[in-house]
Amino acid sequence: MGKQCYVTGRKASTGNNRSHALNANKRRFNANLQKVRILVDGKPKKVWVSARALKSGKVTRV
């Protein structure tokens, strides 16, 4: 599985870089994902979690 928030499902989205001439090049907007240890089914597990989920208290670290 790729880098995706274990709690909220946030992942990278796509968009464009725009030059002064407004030429478009594809780019990725990466979510602010942090690898943290949380309890999953009563056992500690390292998963990717978004910073937004950590700040809002949806996840507690072990």
Swiss-Prot record:
Q: Which organism is it from?
A: Staphylococcus haemolyticus (strain JCSC1435)
**Molecular functions (GO terms):** structural constituent of ribosome
Q: Which InterPro entries match?
A: Bacterial_rp_bL28, Ribosomal_bL28, Ribosomal_bL28/bL31-like_sf, Ribosomal_bL28_bact-type, Ribosomal_bL28_sf
Protein's name according to its UniProt entry: Large ribosomal subunit protein bL28
The gene it comes from is rpmB
Ribosomal protein in keyword set: yes
Family listed:
Belongs to the bacterial ribosomal protein bL28 family.
Name the Gene3D superfamilies for this protein.
Ribosomal protein L28/L24
The parts of the chain that form a coiled coil are none
Instruction: List the lineage, top down.
Output: Bacteria, Bacillati, Bacillota, Bacilli, Bacillales
